[in-house]
Amino acid sequence: SQKKYVFKYAGRNSRLDDIQAAVLDVKLKYLVEDNQHRKEVAHLYYEGIKNPIVTLPDLLPDEQNAYHLFPILVGEGKRDALHDYLEQKGVGTVIHYPIAPHKQECYAKEAWNVPQLSLPITERLADEELSLPIGPTITRDEINDVIRLINIFR
């Protein structure tokens, strides 16, 4: 696709060359440690983020989440504004699916015929989802900055 997150063709992405495999082999040695760090970051987000326009992911009992991502929902139509605000403050966030999958051009073809579907939950997620930084190298100071900036955002 020439434009990020805009898909003309249905398909999949499943590449893994030799170099990527070698890097992955090294990274796997740190998987348990990295997952534990991400769980600690997620816990700090759950404890610290108090902005009423932000909905945190459900925390289910006995769940085992690796927290590869930490997607929040930003209500009141302010997702893009919060994304831009955090970006200006040096905090990288990601909007993973700005267009609901069933509204992508690749599904507009007659064979698929899905753009007319009404999927309100999917559309809400596309409008409100924002993923916070949660990688294995994020520091406590950076986490505190993310929390502080989200809490003062209006």
Label each residue range with its predicted role.
Residues 1-154:
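PLP-dependent aminotransferase class I/II
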